[in-house]
């Protein structure tokens, strides 16, 4: 078989032929039989919901306490090695990040270690993701620090006359109290949202919004770390324009920078950048990523202790890391009214980051995570952790990738990482007291690389979606200059406004037919597509509701070029010309079709109807004009059917239905039929509930598809033409007579 024959056979087999009736809605319903649905009473539903069975109890336990499901099924020989390696790798990264992120949270470094221990243990019991690493996260830590600095600024005067500049410990103790209160309220909010099954709130934080927000947060973190890198003493700012004030403060004091501190920081910065590039390039050959941050901490501590950098060169170091765990303490709930806005923002951002990474890794490894249970888990981690003086936590992106990439299989990997932190807290913490803060600053800045790379989103969104570009930019700018809390609120409002804008200003398309097919596509996009004679097909890609119904009606008339008011006015003028030529003065007052209101002869407009009155359209028949009158009619007055493609309309409200009824009636007044094609069951239900089909004959306007509507229109016109040809001439009939519907 040669290539030509094969091509011909292939072309023949890639066709389909269908012979079926034209499916209007009534015809289709006659062919279908709805399935009987058993509707349960409210009493039956309540009885079923509160029925207690062993299986239901077991499922509830599995849902609320996931460890009871995955731990008994733990494959020891298959999982244990990967979890151990992953736990150690994550733990050595969690140590320096915990110390560094405590600086962002404006609390002593040891509290970063507490926050790397307690919440991780809690998540092991209640979390559903096997691979994410829970603990301090730069963005959340910065948001906590913003609240702490706002309520306890650097120059605060402690009650009793002790100035904060002379009592750093007293100031830090107050900031810890603020951080505990914010963390407790954040946990309560997350837990309540999870119990109420509000896990869907994350969908309102779109990807452009989250990426713009985290990029702005990265700039905030970067500016916050500059003073530690340069070794200068500056006031820490929070709130509106804090990033500007922080940058200006560092630049004003740059002449006082500590050269030794900057040198150590830059050395670690270069080591980490080069090492991370090495890890990325040879990740396929390395059994596990090199723990660069841990080596940087060890090296920085060794150099600082060996050369007495703090005593000899005034390099700021971590300072005292008290051994042992602190006893539980009650957070100060009296601060809730001062921090509730921040707590809401932290709760939502923390959950959004966590569920995003959890779903990404779950999809990669073929399991599911429960968004509502993740909210509950985060809520318990934060609320319980606050009792042990931790600050709010979330999922760390960098540590999660390490935990997954080094072979972690279950939540036990995170548990092992937290045990390494516990070892530091109980026994070895004093070894890191000489660690320069510049080293921690360099670690934080290097880990911001991934967030700064998100600036590359801008050209991508410029090419793909200007609306998503707008969301990204407005989120970034508002979060950068208004602060992360108010910036997030502004961003969510802007994102919701874009949803309204998209539905209020959808795309309107006039469709044409690909010749000899049942395919209908945009007539302006392809040369081969042609309009069906006498038929206009109009498509909208959004629901029709109160926000866009008037725009839909206007767009229909504008895009199709068929405006009933103009047609009526033009026909009036044609009648006048015709009457003048035949010398029949009475013809000037004749009407072309039956209408429900007087129409102005000049512009074809109607007087306003009563606002609350919904007049649903009658079934109209097109009038027959005298043949002599046709030459006076305006060009293009030959459209007999408008087909509204509703395949992309997913719902209609009462205002939309009223507008549609007005459209059908308005076109019907000039003898033009309006058909609805491709209505979903929901749209048909909306039309029915709003009494659009009060006249049952209007069901004949509904067709299963565009092609059904086109064929139905052509059959109707052909039958009308046959009847007009077969009907005997009526010499006594008046030219303005209108056939009865």
UniProtKB/Swiss-Prot annotation:
Q: What does this protein do?
A: Voltage-sensitive motor protein that drives outer hair cell (OHC) electromotility (eM) and participates in sound amplification in the hearing organ. Converts changes in the transmembrane electric potential into mechanical displacements resulting in the coupling of its expansion to movement of a charged voltage sensor across the lipid membrane. The nature of the voltage sensor is not completely clear, and two models compete.
Q: Where are the transmembrane segments?
A: 80-105, 110-125, 138-147, 179-208, 209-230, 262-283, 292-303, 339-361, 371-388, 397-406, 411-429, 437-459, 468-483, 485-498
The alphabetized UniProt keywords are: Cell membrane, Cell shape, Glycoprotein, Hearing, Membrane, Motor protein, Transmembrane, Transmembrane helix
Q: Which residues lie within the membrane without crossing it?
A: 244-248
Note down the stretches annotated as region Extended region for STAS domain. 505-718
Task: List glycan-bearing residues.
Answer: 163, 166
Molecular function terms, GO-annotated? secondary active sulfate transmembrane transporter activity
Q: Which residues form the STAS domain?
A: 525-713
Q: Which GO BP annotation is one of this protein's?
A: sensory perception of sound
List the catalysed reactions.
Answer: 2 hydrogencarbonate(in) + chloride(out) = 2 hydrogencarbonate(out) + chloride(in)
- The residues annotated as site (Contributes to anion binding) are 399
Q: Where in the cell is it found?
A: Cell membrane
Q: How does it sit in the membrane?
A: Multi-pass membrane protein
Q: Where is the composition biased (Low complexity)?
A: 721-730
Gene that this sequence comes from = SLC26A5
- Keyword Transmembrane helix listed: yes
Mind telling me which PROSITE patterns this protein's record contains?
SLC26A (PS01130), STAS (PS50801)
Q: Name one Pfam family in it.
A: Sulfate_transp
One cellular component (GO) term of this entry: plasma membrane
Q: Which domain of life is it from?
A: Eukaryota
Q: Where is this region: Disordered?
A: 718-741
Listed name of the protein: Prestin
**Keyword hit for Transmembrane:** yes
């Amino acid at each position: 078989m040669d290539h030509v024959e094969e091509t011909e056979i292939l072309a023949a087999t890639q066709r389909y032929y269908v012979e079926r009736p034209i499916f209007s809605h009534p015809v289709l319903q006659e062919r279908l039989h709805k399935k009987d649905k058993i509707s349960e009473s409210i009493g039956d539903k309540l009885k079923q919901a509160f029925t207690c069975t062993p299986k239901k109890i077991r499922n509830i336990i599995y849902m609320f306490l996931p460890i009871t499901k995955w731990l008994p099924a733990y494959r020891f020989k298959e999982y244990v090695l990967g979890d151990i390696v992953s736990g150690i790798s994550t733990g050595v990264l969690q140590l320096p990040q915990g110390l560094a992120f405590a600086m962002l949270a404006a609390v002593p470094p040891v509290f970063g270690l507490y926050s790397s221990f307690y919440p991780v243990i809690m998540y092991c019991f209640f979390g559903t993701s096997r691979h994410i690493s829970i603990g301090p996260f730069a963005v959340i830590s910065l948001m906590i620090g913003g609240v702490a600095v706002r309520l306890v600024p650097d120059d605060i005067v402690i009650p009793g006359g002790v100035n904060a500049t002379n009592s750093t410990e007293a100031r830090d103790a107050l900031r810890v109290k603020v951080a505990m209160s914010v963390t407790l309220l954040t946990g309560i909010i997350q837990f309540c949202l999870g119990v109420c099954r509000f896990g869907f709130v994350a969908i309102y934080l779109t990807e452009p919004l989250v990426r713009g927000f985290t990029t702005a947060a990265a700039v905030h973190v970067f500016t916050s770390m500059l003073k530690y890198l340069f070794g200068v003493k500056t006031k820490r700012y929070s709130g509106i324009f804090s990033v500007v004030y922080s940058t200006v403060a560092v630049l004003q004091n740059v002449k006082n920078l500590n050269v030794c501190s900057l040198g150590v920081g830059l050395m670690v910065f270069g080591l980490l950048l080069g090492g991370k590039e090495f890890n990325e390039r040879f990740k396929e050959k390395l059994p596990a990523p090199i723990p660069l941050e841990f080596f940087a901490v060890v090296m920085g501590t060794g150099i600082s202790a060996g050369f007495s950098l703090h005593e000899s060169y005034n390099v700021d170091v971590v300072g005292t890391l008290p051994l042992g765990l602190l006893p539980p303490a009650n957070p100060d709930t009296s601060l809730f009214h001062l921090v509730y806005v921040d707590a809401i923002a932290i709760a939502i951002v923390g959950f959004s980051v966590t569920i995003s990474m959890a779903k990404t890794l779950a999809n990669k490894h073929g399991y599911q995570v429960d968004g509502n249970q993740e909210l509950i888990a985060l809520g318990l981690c934060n609320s319980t952790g606050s009792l042990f003086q931790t600050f709010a936590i979330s999922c760390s992106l960098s540590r999660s990738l390490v935990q997954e990439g080094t072979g972690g299989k279950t939540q036990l990997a995170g548990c092992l990482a937290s045990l390494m932190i516990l070892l530091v807290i109980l026994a070895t913490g004093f070894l890191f007291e000489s660690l320069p803060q510049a080293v921690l600053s360099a670690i934080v800045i290097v880990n911001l690389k991934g967030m700064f790379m998100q600036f590359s989103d801008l050209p991508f969104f410029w090419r793909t979606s200007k609306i998503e570009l707008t969301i990204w930019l407005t989120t970034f700018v508002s979060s950068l200059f208004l602060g992360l809390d108010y910036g997030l609120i502004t961003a969510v409002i802007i994102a919701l406004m874009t949803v309204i804008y998209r539905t209020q200003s959808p795309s309107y398309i006039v469709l044409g037919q690909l010749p000899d097919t049942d395919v209908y596509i945009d007539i302006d996009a392809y040369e081969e597509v042609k309009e069906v004679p006498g038929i206009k097909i109009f498509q909208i890609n959004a629901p029709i509701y109160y926000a866009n119904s008037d725009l839909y009606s206007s767009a229909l008339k504008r895009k199709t070029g068929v405006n009933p008011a103009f047609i009526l006015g033009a026909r009036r003028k044609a009648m006048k010309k015709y009457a003048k030529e035949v010398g029949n003065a009475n013809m000037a007052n004749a009407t072309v079709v039956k209408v429900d209101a007087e129409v102005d002869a000049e512009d074809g407009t109607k007087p306003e109807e009563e606002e609350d009155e919904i007049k649903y359209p009658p079934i109209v028949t097109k009038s027959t004009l005298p043949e002599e009158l046709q030459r006076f009619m305006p060009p293009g007055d030959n459209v007999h059917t408008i087909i509204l493609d509703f395949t992309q309309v997913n719902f209609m409200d009462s205002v939309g239905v009223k507008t549609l009824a007005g459209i059908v009636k308005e076109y019907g007044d000039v003898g033009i039929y309006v058909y609805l094609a491709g209505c979903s069951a929901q749209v048909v239900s909306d039309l029915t509930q709003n009494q659009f089909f009060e006249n049952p004959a209007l069901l004949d306007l509904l067709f299963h598809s565009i092609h059904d509507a086109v064929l139905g229109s052509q059959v109707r016109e052909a039958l009308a033409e046959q009847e007009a040809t077969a009907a005997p001439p009526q010499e006594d009939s008046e030219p303005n007579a209108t056939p009865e519907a």
